[in-house]
């Protein structure tokens, strides 16, 4: 008998069938994520869900063709639909192309048990269910940043003979690099590097795109709280949506990226979630706000809130922060999982590289926002995340680290109220402020020695992730960059 983790009640299935029929949907895009965090998708005619047995039996596929899933001799797997996640794709009007998207969990052969390679069903859903069994819940609000480019040519390099990355110290040239195309770099109303934050049009060339993206995201059930141009030039933007629980926030992340890329393509543009595409400008992050609740979010008790505390923080919130700091180095492998991620985690670009916590202070890895002084608004923000991550893994790992802090009563120490970037190395040592890993290789080494993270991922995903990331690092180490030719050719 087929077991489903989510959306298996007849009411949800019948609702989904009605939505498909009422909207004359022709195709359903069946979605899931691989271990790396890449969205995977295949199409099934809607009639297979409305009149056929796709909801009951799922859809079989080749798991050996998905990175990190199965080897060829064990390749038969079953995608089981989550009827509650069905959404009509709102920008498709052509009746021939009319489509919906639905997430699902991945099962082993015959559809009898959840596959331990599935980030959504095996990792995120498992932890969400664990919280519910204890009468608890958690919500997460990621601040997803990305760039909107007009074009990019991977075969063309730009360079500047007289530009110094060190303000005149050391080398006096800017290395050859790929330079994306953006009118924000070329027009009379150009935005200079690091001067894009909250810029209005006409300097901000992305506002009409953002307005359109908000329109479609809200039809997909993603309520946007606010959006704006970000710090970097060349079309860096941020759109923040209201917080969601663990599985739903992962689904929303993928819907967000799917919509952002498709709306961009409709206008001949390119949306990229690559963390650091621009040299000497800010990178894209995904600061993740989170809070714990007894019962349901907002209607239950806010676990992190204590009205009598100076920062409105309960002792459990402090222990939660302690857990995040304790596991920060291992978390970095999951939260910043690409070689490019570590071009973001450097001083001088508003990135959190120091392991400490603080209220209001954006130089700390963990920040306690101080906007609204009421229990339901009290939360912690983990800033060491970027949008190249797999949210089902990265956000679940943050939750697990925080819960481990509560379980073990890990004291985070006093908050650091100074600008950490301005402290001397001696001052940081005296205060016990550590640093995040500086390369992907360092991060995966820390992940390898963290037993909690191994428990969160399970042995299969842990081993697959390690293998994929070690291979990625080795590929990078073999590549000879244009910078090396500029630096060393005349030795």
Swiss-Prot record:
Offer a single GO CC term for the protein. Answer: membrane
Q: List localization entries.
A: Cytoplasm
Keyword RNA-binding among UniProt keywords:
no
One record GO biological process: glutamine biosynthetic process
Q: How does activity depend on temperature?
A: Optimum temperature is 83 degrees Celsius.
**Keyword Lipid metabolism found:** no
Write the signal peptide boundaries: none
Q: Which residues form the GS catalytic domain?
A: 119-491
Binding locations of Mg(2+) 1: 143, 287, 381
What the entry lists under SMART domains is as follows: Gln-synt_C
MF-aspect GO terms: ATP binding; glutamine synthetase activity; metal ion binding
Return the Pfam families for the record.
Gln-synt_C, Gln-synt_N
UniProtKB keywords: ATP-binding, Cytoplasm, Ligase, Magnesium, Metal-binding, Nucleotide-binding
Question: What's the EC number here?
Answer: 6.3.1.2
Function text: Probably involved in nitrogen metabolism via ammonium assimilation. Catalyzes the ATP-dependent biosynthesis of glutamine from glutamate and ammonia. Beta-glutamate is a much poorer substrate than alpha-glutamate.
Its assembly, as annotated, is:
Oligomer of 12 subunits arranged in the form of two hexagons.
The protein's name in its UniProt record: Glutamine synthetase
Species of origin: Archaeoglobus fulgidus (strain ATCC 49558 / DSM 4304 / JCM 9628 / NBRC 100126 / VC-16)
């Amino acid at each position: 008998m087929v077991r489903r983790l989510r959306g298996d009640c007849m009411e949800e299935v019948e609702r989904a069938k009605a939505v498909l029929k009422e909207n004359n949907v022709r195709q359903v895009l069946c979605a899931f994520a691989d271990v790396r965090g890449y969205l995977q998708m295949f199409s099934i005619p809607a009639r297979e869900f409305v009149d056929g047995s796709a909801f009951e039996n799922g859809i079989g596929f080749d798991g050996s063709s998905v990175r990190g899933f199965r080897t060829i001799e064990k390749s038969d797997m079953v995608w089981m639909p989550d009827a509650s996640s069905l959404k009509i794709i709102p920008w498709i009007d052509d009746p021939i192309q009319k489509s919906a998207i639905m997430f699902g969990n991945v099962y082993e052969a015959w559809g009898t048990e959840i596959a331990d390679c599935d980030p959504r069903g095996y990792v995120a859903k498992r932890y969400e269910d664990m919280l519910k069994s204890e009468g608890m819940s958690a919500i997460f609000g990621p601040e997803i940043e990305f760039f909107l480019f007009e074009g990019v040519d991977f075969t063309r390099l730009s360079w500047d003979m007289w530009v110094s990355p060190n303000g005149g110290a050391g080398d006096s040239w800017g290395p050859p690099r790929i330079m994306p195309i953006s009118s924000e770099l070329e027009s009379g109303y150009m935005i200079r590097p690091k001067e894009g934050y909250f810029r209005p049009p006409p300097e901000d060339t992305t506002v009409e795109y953002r307005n359109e993206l908000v329109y479609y995201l809200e039809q997909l059930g993603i309520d946007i709280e606010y959006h704006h141009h970000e710090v970097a030039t060349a079309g860096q933007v941020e759109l923040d949506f209201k917080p969601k629980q663990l599985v739903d926030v992962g689904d929303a992340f993928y819907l967000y990226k799917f919509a952002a890329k498709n709306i961009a393509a409709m206008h001949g543009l390119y949306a990229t979630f690559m963390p650091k595409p621009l040299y000497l400008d800010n990178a894209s992050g995904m600061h993740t706000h989170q809070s714990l609740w007894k019962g349901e979010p907002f209607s239950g008790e806010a676990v992190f809130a204590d009205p009598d505390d100076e920062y409105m923080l309960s002792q459990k919130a402090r222990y939660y922060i302690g857990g995040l700091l304790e596991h920060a180095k291992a978390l970095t492998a999951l939260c910043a999982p690409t070689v490019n991620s570590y071009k973001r985690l450097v001083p001088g670009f508003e990135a959190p590289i120091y392991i400490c916590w603080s209220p209001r202070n954006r130089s700390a890895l963990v920040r306690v926002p101080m906007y609204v002084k009421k229990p339901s608004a009290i939360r912690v923000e983990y800033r060491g995340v970027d949008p190249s991550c797999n949210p089902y893994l990265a956000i679940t790992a943050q939750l697990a680290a925080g819960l481990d802090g509560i379980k073990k009563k890990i004291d985070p120490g006093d908050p650091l109220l100074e600008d950490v970037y301005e402290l001397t190395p001696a001052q940081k040592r005296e205060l016990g402020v550590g640093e995040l890993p500086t390369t992907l290789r360092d991060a995966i080494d820390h992940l390898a020695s963290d037993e909690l993270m191994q428990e969160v991922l399970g042995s299969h995903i842990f081993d697959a992730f390690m293998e994929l990331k070690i291979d990625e690092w080795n590929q990078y180490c073999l590549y000879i960059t244009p910078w090396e030719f500029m630096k060393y050719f005349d030795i």
